[in-house]
């Protein structure tokens, strides 16, 4: 046996050193400090002292087992148990038990037998049935017995059953080992029963403890059971080893309540939904809906919020916020550093504006020495044309905008992308509505104006009248002390055209127009269309940089690579500098007129930015529709009847024309008839347009386009009619007629005759009969009537009889006498008037 110090023994037995020294002294082992060692002889003496403190008690128990019938079997069980006496306590605070110390010493020596218990169990079994009964009996005894004493046990204390059987002699017989294991099993069963009863029935435990003390037995308690050392293995009667027996545990959920709320920093982007905002603040979506409701906003968890509303919600709930910069990618891609480049003078961009048929395109045609007007339907410019003209004093880029009312937005775009505006006013017509509008656009864009008084060659031309009318609209000529140059021109004879160009170039010198000729190109989309065999085609005005074939470009929500470029004469070019209009091919789709064009080096970034812009447009459209729902509800409140809707599918040749027609048609909507353009696009009418028209009962309108063969066949089958136009006035007039057809006819009353009562007769069959003279119009038998007394209507009904002398009459004309019987009315008096009227339908007009 290895030597051990007093300190090590005290540490392994979980006892204080002073208490252990006193206990060793009581056993006759003198030690003075914790560094003193214990010899094997002293350890053996210590064990003998512990064993001598134990007593052996014998107990016999006889039980009776019933068999079938009247037979009984007596079962006698003898138990021997060693019970250790309590050692005298040296200190009141220290609990010293021989069993504890014995277990501790066993852990040190590991080969000394501390506890020797032998239970002689004699069982008398006469037959196999008695053995089975005994097994059932022992199983019932092993179960804990809980009486209904008003207490509820949620869990038993965890009891570790450990092995306390050790071998003292290597030659111990196998039968003795088996007996020890069975004895350990019995001790555990009784201990569990005692522990359960101790917890459930406190009073019964005390009474049983007294009885057990009288017979020399000591009752086990939970504290003693918890102090058993080693692993006690449980075996059944046949020696089969069982698993470790443990009392069930009760799982407890540990939760620490937060002391204060967590303040989060929420990143808010435009169009954030309620559910996304709730997730970032770690709250339920219903809480945010509740906050919105308190703010007077009805919302769902999937509804998008603007940034201002989201900020209010975050601050209301006690969190911080940061705004997400959604334009970071756009700023990084579209902003071009041109600090290393030098500016050069560029050609002026001139827009020709004015009223319809005042000669804008004719003037430009004379300047370009071409016949552009011949190619326009009806002599009216349908979309913007961009042309570059070279003169002796420099180049000028012209933009020709439509003049009639439908193309307001196109004129506004032309004014934004131009340097100088040539305002064409016909000398024989004066200032017209589109002339005033052109002046407003030019002033809003802060663009200088040069007035061209056209058609000066006509005899009825009056330029002084034009000057006077423009002066009233704050366009003051230089001759009157203003800053606007007036030039009399004739697009037919060419008179004054050279002076006009000189005035434009002079104005451009004053403006000192400059641009960067190098670097990535920037510009604006003047016009766009979809051409068969070429795909999307965009007319672009380059404003800065150098646009080259093969560049990656981004136009609004469309992107692509420049596959080909053509100038205003239709010739292919490889590069285009500032103030140069070009047609480009290669875009992914048709961009909107007015979109900015920018060259991006990385095609992947261009695609990503285009997708981001498209998503923004969709979100903005959804938000706008959501905001209009409530206003539409209030606008429709109190209106009688259902609003008729004229659905239209519009296809055009160019983007600008489609946009202008769309705006003009939407303006035709009234409270009774609404124009709904369910689809619009560029290019020929296809079979998908026909299918959509059938599904939505819409009218298909083509402006300068036609239907393809597949669409025509499908239209014949489904009965869809196409309407083709090349003049916008005709299109608008036909749509007005179609809207008038949807209007419900108006019912109007028309008085057709008046009869004056001269005398009243009594009839047994008809009651009161009025003898009348028809003084106006004609009285008809089948028409409704009104009875007037002193020009006040006192009755309205129908005629029951109308007679001329004794014969029935269907009508009586003016100047003839007749007898009139009013149905369900007998209070007819002399001097009354009987008014006959009819209800007619009158078609409504817009």
UniProtKB/Swiss-Prot annotation:
Predominant place of localization: cytoplasm
Region (G5) residue spans: 490-492
Taxonomic lineage from the root: Bacteria, Pseudomonadati, Pseudomonadota, Gammaproteobacteria, Thiotrichales
This protein's name: Translation initiation factor IF-2
Positions contributing to GTP binding: 354-361, 400-404, 454-457
Region (G1): 354-361
Gene name in the database record: infB
Signal sequence bounds: none
Region of interest called G3, as start-end residue ranges on this chain: 400-403
Stretches for region G2: 379-383
């Amino acid at each position: 046996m290895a030597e051990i110090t007093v300190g090590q023994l005290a540490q392994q037995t979980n006892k204080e050193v002073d208490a252990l020294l006193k206990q060793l002294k009581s056993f006759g082992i003198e030690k003075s400090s914790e560094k003193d060692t214990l010899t094997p002889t002293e350890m053996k003496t210590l064990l003998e002292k512990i064993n001598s403190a134990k007593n052996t008690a014998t107990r016999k128990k006889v039980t009776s087992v019933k068999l079938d019938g009247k037979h009984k079997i007596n079962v006698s069980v003898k138990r021997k148990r060693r019970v250790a006496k309590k050692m005298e306590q040296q200190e009141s605070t220290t609990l010293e038990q021989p069993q504890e110390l014995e277990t501790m010493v066993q852990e040190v020596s590991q080969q000394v037998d501390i506890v020797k218990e032998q239970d002689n169990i004699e069982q008398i079994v006469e037959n196999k049935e008695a053995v089975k009964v005994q097994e059932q009996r022992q199983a019932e005894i092993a179960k804990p017995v809980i009486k209904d004493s008003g207490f509820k046990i949620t869990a038993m204390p965890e009891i570790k059953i450990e092995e306390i059987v050790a071998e003292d002699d290597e030659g111990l017989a196998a039968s003795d080992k088996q007996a020890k294991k069975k004895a350990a099993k019995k001790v555990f069963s009784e201990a569990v029963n005692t522990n359960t009863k101790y917890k459930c029935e406190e009073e019964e435990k005390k009474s049983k403890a007294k009885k057990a003390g009288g017979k020399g037995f000591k009752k086990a308690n939970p504290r003693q059971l918890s102090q058993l050392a080693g692993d006690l293995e449980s075996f059944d009667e046949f020696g089969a080893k069982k698993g470790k027996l443990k009392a069930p545990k009760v799982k407890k959920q540990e939760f620490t309540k937060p002391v204060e709320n967590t303040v989060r920093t929420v990143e808010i982007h435009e169009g954030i939904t309620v559910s996304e905002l709730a997730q970032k603040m770690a709250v339920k979506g219903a809480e945010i809906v509740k906050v919105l409701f308190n703010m007077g906003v009805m919302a769902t968890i999937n509804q998008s919020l603007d940034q201002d509303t989201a900020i209010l919600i975050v601050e209301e709930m006690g969190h911080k916020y940061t705004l997400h910069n959604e334009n970071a990618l756009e700023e990084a891609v579209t902003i071009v550093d041109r600090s290393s480049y030098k500016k050069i003078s560029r050609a002026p961009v001139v827009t020709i504006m004015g009223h319809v048929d005042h000669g804008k395109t004719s003037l430009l045609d004379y300047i370009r020495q071409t016949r552009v007007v011949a190619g326009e339907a009806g002599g009216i410019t349908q979309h913007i044309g961009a042309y570059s003209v070279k003169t002796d004093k420099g180049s000028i880029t012209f933009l020709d905008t439509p003049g009639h009312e439908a193309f307001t937005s196109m004129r506004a775009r032309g004014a934004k992308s131009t340097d100088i505006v040539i305002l064409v006013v016909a000398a024989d017509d004066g200032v017209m509505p589109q002339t005033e509008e052109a002046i407003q656009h030019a002033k809003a864009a802060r663009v200088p104006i040069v007035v061209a008084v056209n058609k000066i060659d006509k005899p009825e031309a009056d330029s002084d009248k034009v000057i006077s009318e423009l002066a009233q609209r704050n366009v003051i000529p230089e001759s009157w002390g203003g800053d606007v140059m007036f030039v009399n021109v004739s697009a037919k004879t060419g008179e004054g055209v050279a002076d006009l160009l000189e005035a434009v170039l002079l104005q451009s010198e004053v403006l000192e127009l400059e641009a960067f000729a190098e670097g990535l190109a920037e510009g604006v989309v003047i016009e766009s269309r979809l051409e068969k065999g070429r795909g999307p085609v965009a007319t672009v005005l380059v404003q800065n940089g150098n646009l080259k074939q093969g560049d990656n470009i981004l136009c609004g929500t469309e992107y692509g690579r420049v596959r080909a470029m053509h100038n205003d004469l239709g010739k292919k070019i490889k590069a285009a500098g500032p103030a140069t209009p070009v047609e480009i091919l290669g875009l992914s789709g048709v961009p909107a007129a007015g979109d900015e064009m920018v060259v991006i080096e990385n095609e992947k970034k261009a695609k990503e930015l285009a997708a981001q812009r498209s998503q923004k447009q969709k979100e903005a459209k959804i938000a706008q529709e959501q905001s209009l729902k409530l206003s539409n509800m209030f606008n429709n409140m109190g209106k009688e009847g259902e609003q008729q809707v004229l659905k239209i599918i519009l296809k055009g040749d160019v983007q600008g024309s489609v946009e202008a027609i769309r705006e003009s048609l939407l303006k035709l909507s009234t409270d009774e008839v609404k124009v709904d353009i369910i689809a619009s696009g560029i290019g020929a009418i296809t079979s998908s347009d026909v299918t959509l028209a059938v599904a939505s009962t819409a009218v298909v309108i083509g402006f300068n386009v036609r239907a393809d063969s597949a669409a025509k066949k499908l239209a014949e089958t489904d009965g869809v009619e196409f309407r083709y136009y090349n003049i916008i006035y005709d299109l608008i007039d036909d749509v007005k007629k179609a809207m008038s057809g949807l209007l419900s006819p108006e019912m109007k009353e028309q008085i057709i005759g008046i009869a004056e009562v001269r005398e009243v007769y009594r009839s047994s069959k008809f009651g009161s009969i009025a003898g009348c003279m028809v003084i106006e119009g004609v009285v008809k038998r089948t028409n409704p009537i009104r009875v007037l007394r002193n020009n006040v209507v006192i009755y309205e009904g129908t005629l029951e009889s109308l007679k001329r002398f004794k014969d029935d009459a269907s009508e009586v004309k003016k100047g003839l006498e007749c007898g009139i019987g009013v149905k369900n009315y007998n209070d007819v008096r002399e001097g009354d008037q009987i008014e006959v009227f009819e209800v007619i339908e009158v078609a409504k007009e817009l």
